Amino acid sequence: MTDMNKWRHIFKLDPAKPISDEDLMKICTSDTDAIMIGGTDDITEENVAHLMHKVKCYSLPIVLEISNLESVVPGFDLYFIPTVLNSRDVKYHNGLLLEALKSYGTLIDFNEVVFEGYVVLNPDCKVAKLTQADTMIDDEDIEAYAQMINDMYQLPVMYIEYSGVYGETNLVKAAADMLTETQLFYGGGISNYEEAEMMASIADTIIVGNIIYEDINKALKTVKVKETH
């Protein structure tokens, strides 16, 4: 099984967004720990498979973060299933997992499945609107979510998602301080090395996504956080 406990940096690629072969090569040979493929809109079996096959030319772990069952294809090292704990809609807590088990329960290799405890904190992002997430969260709330994930559900990953904006470091640190076993992922708004360095000093693993499509050189510089963390 792929060991993700040592991952400090992940590049997240959206299969619905175009990326040149040259930029993809730079991303995949950058010394990042893994490539995550995932997104919210227009995620299909075809574009997921197309991007996966391109990434698999390089020797690094590749993960699919599942947003719908129709886009799930074989060949990934790990499959991440989000449960959005601050969603007001129960289907985003366990609905995706329920449908996966109903459709593929006897075929799933559970050694390849990672259940992520998601907390979405940017009210304006697509995933917050889609999941009807309650983003009005203070330190006490995030600490309680962290305890829920670490101590009660005992999930391997807590993912704090700001999706497009840079997050509040005090909230990320409040969560980090409560986690003893669960790995803390942070994603959202990292657009330069300094922001990456700050979040890497708090979270176990940082996820860098949008900046790949805006400024590839700034994206590549974020990998340097591995030298100090």
Swiss-Prot record:
Keyword Metal-binding: yes
Gene Ontology terms: biological process: glycerophospholipid biosynthetic process
Keywords associated with the record: Lipid biosynthesis, Lipid metabolism, Magnesium, Metal-binding, Phospholipid biosynthesis, Phospholipid metabolism, Transferase
Catalysed conversion reaction: sn-glycerol 1-phosphate + all-trans-heptaprenyl diphosphate = 3-heptaprenyl-sn-glycero-1-phosphate + diphosphate
Swiss-Prot/TrEMBL cofactor(s): Mg(2+)
Single GO MF annotation: magnesium ion binding
Database matches in InterPro entries: GGGP/HepGP_synthase_I, GGGP/HepGP_synthase_sf, GGGP_HepGP_synthase
Residues the record lists as binding sn-glycerol 1-phosphate: 12, 159-164, 189, 209-210
EC numbers for this chain: 2.5.1.n9
Enzyme class: transferase
Binding site for Mg(2+): 14, 40
Pathway annotation: Membrane lipid metabolism; glycerophospholipid metabolism
Binding partners and assembly: Homodimer.
Family: Belongs to the GGGP/HepGP synthase family. Group I subfamily.
Protein role: Prenyltransferase that catalyzes in vivo the transfer of the heptaprenyl moiety of heptaprenyl pyrophosphate (HepPP; 35 carbon atoms) to the C3 hydroxyl of sn-glycerol-1-phosphate (G1P), producing heptaprenylglyceryl phosphate (HepGP). This reaction is an ether-bond-formation step in the biosynthesis of archaea-type G1P-based membrane lipids found in Bacillales.
PANTHER family cross-referenced by the UniProt entry: HEPTAPRENYLGLYCERYL PHOSPHATE SYNTHASE (PTHR40029:SF2), PTHR40029
Name under which the protein is recorded: Heptaprenylglyceryl phosphate synthase
Protein species of origin: Staphylococcus saprophyticus subsp. saprophyticus (strain ATCC 15305 / DSM 20229 / NCIMB 8711 / NCTC 7292 / S-41)
Gene name linked to the record: pcrB
